[in-house]
Amino acid sequence: MSEYRAVKGTKDIFPDEITSWKYIEGVIHRVVGLYGFQEIRTPVFEYTDLFQRSIGSTTDIVGKEMFSFRPEPDGRSVTLRPEMTAGVMRAFLQANLSSASPVHKLYYIAELFRKERPQAGRQRQFSQFGAEMLGASSPEAVAEVIDMMMQVFTSLGVSGLRLRINTLGDLDDRVRYRDALRAYLEPHSGLLDAPSRERLEKNPLRILDSKNPDIQSVIADAPKLHDFLNPSARAEFDQVLLYLDQKSIEYVIDPLLVRGLDYYCHTAFEVVSPELGAQDAIGGGGRYDGLARELGSKSDIPAVGFAVGMERLLITMEKQGLLRHIVPSGPRVYIVLQNEELKTHALSACDLLRRSGIRTEMDLCGRSMKAQMREANRQHADYALFVGKSEVESQAYGLKNLRTSEQDFLSIREMIARLASSTKHVEVPDGGPD
């Protein structure tokens, strides 16, 4: 056994589990395509100040959780991306995409990195899928993004999820609320834990994110943000809720929901799963109209998006029994060789089948026919193709259906035509055995 181990907070994903990942990714690609979203891929690291400006210097992510280093002699720090929205917005601005079209719908499935305490559904290297609508953040746009996220869950068969939603108002609303919240919490500062006391000075809204039951009891009677909203922000939120009602999307208004990133404004939302325990958030998002200006744009750019934790989604699906039917697809054909002297014939048949678009495996270890049949069954092959002396002489090979045990004798070309007709049309190449 090797002395080397995966780094703490990371894990290897082997082929059996990859099958579930590929299934989920396939559903994501299909559903978001129905809404007109296109995939974007950004660098895995960005300049550190991008995240400091966008996420917020007082957040736990920037303060404690980023993997940063200085690769260049000029000493400018770069960071492995802890989230995707800032990088997507940076790419959008750098490429001046708004000049080509006012609205861009982008999505991603990406690896992210945070220095968190490893636990179930929370690793230091993790995956998210998410979507960003850049150039629009109207109530209809917000409702569409939420609807698409929920449709992914529905298409995967996930049940029991709860959508929590709130409005953060505009900047002036949040400043008034921040002052009122601080005034309420300061007399209770002795009841706050160390992280909350630090947040009280820097950004008291972060305290509302606390999962500590003692802190939650303190903030239960705190002022509510909705009491500080201006009429326009309140009306806009009501319109979002109306569109969600029209789409039959159930939700719970949570006045304490603020999300963990400073760039959010107006509508914010979160989806929680009862299968995840105390850390129950499976995904969330909201509006972030001011992010573009923070990153150098001359004006705000309407924007709304979300992100979903892939590992947390997998845990939820596993606990709901939704992954049992997902098994690795085996080869269409497994070639069973009678003896090593016939290997060249078997290799030729294998090449022809593969070049005809038929997934084919064969023994490369010199095992007995019995062992080869066990391997064919272990790999969940559909058919076994027998290559023996009599088959080579007659050019009629035994093709056994491993599901029904039915067996026919066919030439390779006949075999290709039969197998291809049940999958997709392919050209039968010339050359090799007939």
From Swiss-Prot:
It catalyses: tRNA(His) + L-histidine + ATP = L-histidyl-tRNA(His) + AMP + diphosphate + H(+). GO terms for cellular component: cytoplasm. The keyword Nucleotide-binding applies. SUPFAM superfamilies: Class II aaRS ABD-related, Class II aaRS and biotin synthetases. Gene3D superfamilies: Anticodon-binding domain, Bira Bifunctional Protein, Domain 2. It comes from the Bacteria. Its EC number is 6.1.1.21. GO terms for molecular function: ATP binding; histidine-tRNA ligase activity. Homodimer. Belongs to the class-II aminoacyl-tRNA synthetase family. HAMAP family: His_tRNA_synth. PANTHER family: HISTIDINE--TRNA LIGASE, MITOCHONDRIAL-RELATED, HISTIDYL-TRNA SYNTHETASE. This is Histidine--tRNA ligase.
